[in-house]
Design a protein with these regions (language model features):
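C-terminal motif of bacterial Sec signal peptides marking the signal peptidase cleavage site
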Residues: 26-29
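Solvent-exposed coil/turn segments that connect beta secondary-structure elements
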Residues: 110-112, 137, 147, 219-220, ...
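N-terminal secretory signal peptides and thylakoid transit peptides that target proteins
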Residues: 3-22
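C-terminal lobe and pocket-closing loops
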Residues: 221-302, 324-331, 335, 343
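Surface-exposed aromatic
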Residues: 305-326
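Hinge/capping helix and adjacent helix->loop/strand transition within the periplasmic-binding protein
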Residues: 70, 94-102, 117-202, 268-302
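N-terminal (or domain-start) structured segment
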Residues: 31-128, 185-216, 221-224, 298, ...
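Ligand-binding pocket segment of bilobal, Venus flytrap-like solute-binding proteins
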Residues: 157, 168-247, 330
Length: 343
C-alpha cells in the first residue's frame, strides 16, 4: 500500500480487540497560548491524548511527563487514555476516527505507526494525519533475565545456536521485531521462538521474571530504574548509548547484522487527526506552538530527568520535519516487508 494513500473515513470505529482505558487528567496552568481558535475560545474543553500502549510503558510515561507542562503552555486540561492492542493499531484507529477539532491527539511511535498501514491493512495512511512534532528517539536494545548464562549479545547468539530460545518483542511489527528478525536472518544456524508481548511493560515484566531468554525493547522505555536487575546484552548500533551501560553490536564484532552501522530506534511523536490544520488552522497552530514551548520549560526537563534520564534523548522537530521523518521511516520499513511476513 502506498504510504501516501488517503482512505475514506469510515462511519464506525473499528477496533481489533478489547480496549483498556486508563485516564489521567493533566493540570491546567497559566494560559500562555490559548484563545487562538477560529472562534476565539479554544481550548474550552479537555484534550484527549491517546497512548496506543498499556499504562507504564515508555510511551505512556513520556506522555504523562509531558502533559502537565503542555497544560500550562496551552491553558487546557489533558486526559491521557490508553488504547493498547494490535501493535498500536487500536489506538491508531481511535485517532483516525476522532473529529479533527483540536481536542484529540496521540503520542504514537515510529516505526510502529508506519508498520500498521504497511503490514496490517490499517484503514489509514500517512496523509490521514497531521503532525505536531517529535518528542524523543530511543535506541533499540536487547536485554536478558538476571542469572542468564550469557553476558552480551555475542554470547547470546552462541548460546542460541545450541539451545532453543524465546525472544520477546514489544510488537509484531516495528523496531524491536525488526531487530530480532535481522539478527535471526543473519545467521543460518539461528532460529528464535519470537513472541509479541504487546508493549514495553509486559516485555519488562517477562524479562524480569525470566519468562523469555532475551527481549528487545528501548533502554529508556524498559526503564533505567532497572539497571542491575537485568543483563543489558547490547544496542543495535555501532556506537552505543549513554542511558544504560551496554556494549553496541559494533563493539561486539557483530557488524554483519544489518543496520548496525546506521543504528535505528523508536521515535515518539505527537499526531493529530487529519484535517485539523485545514479545518481549524488556528487551533492547529496553538497546539504546535504550545507543544514546542514545552521543550523550553525547565519544569518539563526536570520532570524528564526524574524519569530515568529521558531528558538526555529529548529531540523536538517541527511539524514539517516530523512529516518528512514519517515518510522516510515508511520507505525504510517497506524494504523489510519480506522479513515481517515471517513473524
Amino acid at each position: 500500500m502506498s504510504t501516501n494513500e488517503t482512505h475514506d473515513r469510515p462511519t464506525r470505529r473499528r477496533l481489533l480487540q478489547s480496549v483498556g482505558i486508563v485516564g489521567l487528567t493533566g493540570l491546567a496552568g497559566c494560559q500562555d497560548i490559548a484563545g487562538s481558535g477560529s472562534d476565539g475560545s479554544y481550548p474550552d474543553g479537555r484534550i484527549e491524548v491517546i497512548v496506543p500502549w498499556s499504562q507504564g510503558g515508555g510511551t505512556d510515561r513520556a506522555t504523562r511527563a509531558t502533559t502537565p507542562t503542555w497544560a500550562e503552555t496551552l491553558g487546557a486540561d489533558f486526559v491521557v487514555q490508553n488504547y493498547s492492542g494490535g501493535s498500536t493499531q487500536v489506538g491508531g484507529e481511535r485517532l483516525y476516527n476522532a473529529d479533527p477539532d483540536g481536542y484529540t491527539v496521540a503520542m504514537w511511535n515510529m516505526p510502529q505507526m508506519q508498520a500498521t498501514w504497511l503490514f496490517q491493512d490499517a484503514p489509514y495512511g500517512m496523509d490521514d494525519f497531521d503532525y505536531v512534532g517529535t518528542h524523543h528517539l530511543d535506541p533499540t536494545m536487547w536485554f536478558a533475565p538476571p542469572g542468564s548464562p550469557y553476558e552480551d549479545m555475542a554470547e547470546f547468539i552462541e548460546y542460541a545456536r545450541e539451545n532453543e530460545v524465546t525472544v520477546g518483542t514489544t510488537a509484531a511489527i516495528g523496531n524491536t521485531a525488526l531487530s530480532a528478525l535481522l539478527v535471526e536472518d543473519t545467521y543460518d544456524d539461528l532460529e528464535f521462538n519470537l513472541v509479541n508481548l504487546e508493549g514495553g511493560t509486559p516485555t519488562r515484566q517477562a524479562t524480569l521474571a525470566g519468562d523469555v531468554d532475551a527481549a528487545v525493547n528501548q533502554p529508556w522505555a524498559f526503564n533505567p530504574d532497572h539497571v542491575g536487575d537485568v543483563i543489558a546484552l547490547g544496542t543495535h548500533d555501532s556506537g552505543g548509548q549513554e542511558l544504560w551501560p551496554a556494549p553496541a553490536f559494533g563493539e561486539l564484532g557483530l557488524d554483519e547484522i544489518p543496520l548496525v552501522e546506521e543504528g535505528f530506534g523508536q521515535w515518539k511523536l505527537i499526531v493529530a487527526p487529519g484535517g485539523l490544520e485545514d479545518e481549524y488552522p488556528d487551533r492547529y497552530e496553538a497546539l504546535v506552538d504550545s507543544y514546542a514551548e514545552v521543550f523550553e520549560r525547565d519544569a518539563f526537563h526536570a520532570r524528564a530527568e526524574e524519569q530515568g534520564g529521558l531528558d538526555e534523548i529529548l529531540e523536538y522537530n517541527d511539524p514539517e520535519s516530523t512529516a518528512t521523518e514519517v515518510e522516510s521511516y515508511s520507505e525504510f520499513m517497506e524494504e523489510f516487508e519480506p522479513l515481517f511476513d515471517r513473524f
